[in-house]
Amino acid sequence: MNYEFKIIAFTNDPQFSISLTRECNKYGFSLSFIDSESEIINELDDKIISVTLLDLNNFQEDPFQLCETIKTDHGIPVFGVLNKFSKHVQERAKKTGFDLIFTKKMLLRSIREVVIHVSNE
């Protein structure tokens, strides 16, 4: 299958991972789950628009530092997801360079629209 859009996800939330996989399959988006920033380079392809999705609640590495590293080293958009909005986390994420922040539920409900928006940027 030829994909035009790829999500590279850092999460250890099994329920969210299953739901995200289901939604990506429904719309034909490529999805990879990785455990470290060093794996991103293997997932990038010049022919495919890629974004990174960082779980702000359930990841062992510091997602804010990870965002800065990804933006500096790879220059791809970084989205943050969390279980429930927190003004403090949202402000910190914005300062760190996250492109967009979603609750997991909101992202799953609107993933198609988000991908269309990012693809048109």
Language-model-derived ranges and their functions:
Residues 35-51:
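Acidic, metal-coordinating helix/loop segments flanking the phosphotransfer/catalytic sites
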Residues 70-75:
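Conserved phosphotransfer cores of two-component systems
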Residues 4-14:
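Conserved acidic segment of CheY-like receiver
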Residues 76-85:
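A short, hydrophobic beta-strand element within the central beta-sheet of small alpha/beta folds
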Residues 111-121:
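Receiver (REC) domain switch/output surface
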Residues 53-69:
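Conserved phosphotransfer microenvironments
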Residues 85-100:
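Alpha4 helix (beta4-alpha4-beta5 surface) of REC/receiver domains from two-component response regulators
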Residues 14-32:
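Two-component/phosphorelay signaling modules centered on CheY-like receiver
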